Amino acid sequence: MNTRNMFDILRKGIFKDEITQIEKILLKMEDNTYEYVDVFLEKYESQQKLLLKLTKAITEYLSNLKPQLSKQENIYVKHIKSSNEAKTELEIFNCYKEISISKEKKINSLLKLVRESAQDYTINEENDILYHSEISAKKNASPMEFGDASFDLEKQRLHFANSNLHSIESERNESSLSLDSGESEKKSEEDNGNGEQNYIPEQYERLDSPVKEKIINTCCKGKAEPPNYERIKPKAKKGNQMQKIKISKLGTAETQTEDVMNKSSQKENNDILRKHKTSVKFPTNLDALNSCTMENHEINELTATNKMNDGPITKCARETINIKNLKTSNLERNQNSPKNKRTVSYERLANSFSFNALNDYNLKKGGEKLRKKAIKRALKDRGSQDKAYGGVVQSNSRQPKVGFHVNNSSSGHNDNEGNHSLILSSKTKSPQLFNNEKKDESYSGFSNTNSYAIEETSRALMGTSKTRKPENKSKYLIKNGWFEDSLNSEIWSDANPLDWRKTDILEESTSIVYK
């Protein structure tokens, strides 16, 4: 099948805008290659609507040909048609998204649909006549030769499609995470009398109920049973109890151990699970939760105490972890053990509240953008003057703009040793920490009143607070990356150029609790 001819057919439909973008790519490349689809998908794969329209167009193109399709292709077309009629666009895209987590497999799965259609159909470009080639049971069989001069080019392209198709299937078989030992495949071959394996698209095997059941009941009834998502692990040795492994949507696993005889049997069961094909790591301590770096996991909440040996606990995925309610026997038994002490200290945690280190703390996604936005707002309201005095931005307005200041000293508010103020410079367009001891006479002092909440919070976190603590208050809230003291909230005026509470970049609030 000529890829350009396929796009010519699609151009007659409702895909004019999308095809014009494709044609720009086609002009830069040679004709009669499948790199058209590769480049198109790599460039526009992130646009879900465009991917859906292309998928629907290919499906419509295949269904309108109406030749005598093979058994496997007929099942595949029924799948696509039924899903397009019964499901919304979002659900259809989720079907293709469930093919694989990686980007390459999502692209290859859609290419597989195009290349399978190209295996069975060849186009004579001179007469524009559609020929149906005879394909044997093996997928690598050579297509039928019609004796046409232009068919040599088609033959080369089909050979290219076959080679890529086999490489895709081999990679999929090697990276399969199925818990079966091939029993389901053997059963499907036995059900099919001719030894041909029933073709069930990969994206429908991974769907959850009730979408999966509806598609299989309408399209694949009696062909093959859907895979079991809950499997029971056989006993490893006599006396050990069974463990259930439930595969979730994110690809992780949850274990439920029932009546384990002793510690040795529990250890043996864990060793068996580690050697399993799923290769799922089960977090057994808080360190494993801190080091969670999976793509689907997001930092939702950060909770900490004022103890020096306690650090922030990262909330991964949908699990809820609270330091107050975390009373496990393992933590109580090994509370003072050096092995279980987390490495994140409160001095490091307090330093991370500085303006330059916010990206390292809880603003990983929008920190840099947020930082530039605050600087831009501060420089915009500066006025004609080109100086910033001790962290307070000079402006033409009567009300001064409150700057950012962190007091690293523990001796009191009026001590200048170790104090640093944030200087906004129009030349560098970036914040700079300026030491009060070395600054020029043109820079005046800073305001301790405006920086009270920051100083008090950093002192409380490091356990070196020598000033008063709020009465009957045990919490400092950090909302959208900014401190808010319940007793001193009036110091943060709306005119503050660094006040980020009104921005909508961060969606979730973070709280720090100290005792």
Curated annotation (Swiss-Prot):
Keywords: Meiosis. GO terms for biological process: meiotic cell cycle. It comes from the Eukaryota. Residues 165-204 are annotated as: Disordered. Has a role in meiosis. This is Meiotically up-regulated gene 68 protein. It comes from Schizosaccharomyces pombe (strain 972 / ATCC 24843) (Fission yeast).
